[in-house]
Amino acid sequence: MCFVGRPNTGKSTLTNALVGQKIAITANQPETTRHPIRGIVHRDDAQIIVVDTPGLHRPRTLLGERLNEVVKDTYADMDLIAITIPADEKIGPGDRWILDNVRKVAPKTPLMGIITKIDKVSRDRVALQLMALHKLLGEDSEVVPVSAVTGEQRDILLDVITSLLPEGPKFYPDDHVTDDDTNTRIAELVREAALSGLKDELPHSVAVEVDEIIPNPDRPGTLNVHVIIYVERPGQKTILMGKNGRRFNGIIHAARPQICKLLDSNVYLDLRIKVLKNWQSDPKQLGRLGF
């Protein structure tokens, strides 16, 4: 099943809450998720594969167009689609546009609603949002309010999702929480650290690639992790470096402990920033970066 919705409606935070650990990065900026992330929820009565998709939006770049194509392809493969609406924002044209796209691509797929971020509003506001989402989806539709931050209604949401999914074989061992490879997860952790505190268009211009992971020849038990951050203009590189390299060092300081935990090893993080001019609109560079 997958979560769909406008950018920044809490899809990635909810994915992490259901899985029980962090597999999807989160940021205050919209359009943070750039590829479908599969989280695996293990229950006594079910194994649920939750797909966190990039937010469907009206694209401004070739990257945006390709992300939308990926999202729509994901819809077509799902057994259940859940549209996410924040409790603190009114349903608007963007939500209706997404719902129309979902129904065009996957007209026969069951659809449910999830009201996210209920910890931010009053009970009365949640009740009003419940009525509004029922009106949007249909009075017989399942709609569940939930807070990924506090965990309120988490188990109820999983119960409803389980009831709506068809029976099928178990796909993953009990110790698997995602099918993302290690390099992808490392790149995402570095990108999350790089996005922290950025404003305007710069977050959309940041891409990350893991160059290599090799044993440190001088430090047994330590891995050298070589990572490249790409931006589109020299001025953006200057911003990421920060005054006297402070922002750059902050990225390393924030990402390294999480990479150590992921690899279960001490890590030397070698980070470089390179300019890849207008990569978001360059088909060749997009292909190179996995888009």
Task: Go through each PLM region and give its residues.
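Conserved G1/Walker A P-loop phosphate-binding module
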Residues: M1-L80, I85
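PAPS/PAP-binding and catalytic site of the sulfotransferase fold
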Residues: L14, L18, D155-L164, V227-V231
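Conserved glycine(s) of the Walker
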Residues: G10, Q153, R247
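Conserved, well-folded catalytic cores of nucleic-acid-processing
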Residues: Q21, I40-D44, T74-I81, V105, ...
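Catalytic P-loop NTPase motifs of RecA-like helicase/translocase cores
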Residues: T33, H57-R58, K90-I91, V121-S122, ...
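P-loop NTP-binding site
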Residues: T182-F291
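Conserved C-terminal guanine-recognition region of P-loop GTPase G domains, centered on the G4
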Residues: V41-Q47, R66-V143, I214-T222
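Canonical P-loop GTPase G-domain recognition
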Residues: T109-M112, D119-T182
